[in-house]
Amino acid sequence: DRFLPSMQQIFVVVHLIGKILYSFVDALGNDESQRFYATKGKYYIAEGQRLFRDRQQAHLQSFYSKSAEIFPRICVNMQRFLDAMFILFEMRKNEDLQFTQNIDQTFVTKAKLYIDKHLVCNKRSNGDIISYVALETCHTTANLFDNYLFKNTLNLFNIDHSLNQTSIPSTQ
């Protein structure tokens, strides 16, 4: 697709961004992202506890409880993806990239330059590079997770539905 980066381009840029620690609290102490994901986590835990008290399906309890653990990880992965997309679109805007082009050493060199120039990161005294997970990223992730990933997971592992389904005999 000439309008979107290839999966290879995205993967390479994510790799080139390298080892970055992501924080939900920015350098100025803004913790809106952290408060947002903590609130989501509390909701998932409360739902899991409610299902436990109501003696509802154990797998649902487990999914809700696990959601509290994985949601911040998905936020971080979404931020990495958005950072990579930002770099790729900056390269394209400045005519240093066509989304149909192959990855070669020139692409890698230019991508590294764009990462250094455009990706806003803070460096700690111990050398760790820190980037901030934006509140908007948490909102986007919540929308994707709640309305797609979580619902599809529940549908895939719906025990009530699968118990009422008859097995289709093998034709082999």
Task: Give residue ranges: language-model regions.
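Phosphate-handling catalytic cores of nucleic-acid transaction enzymes
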Residues: 1-172
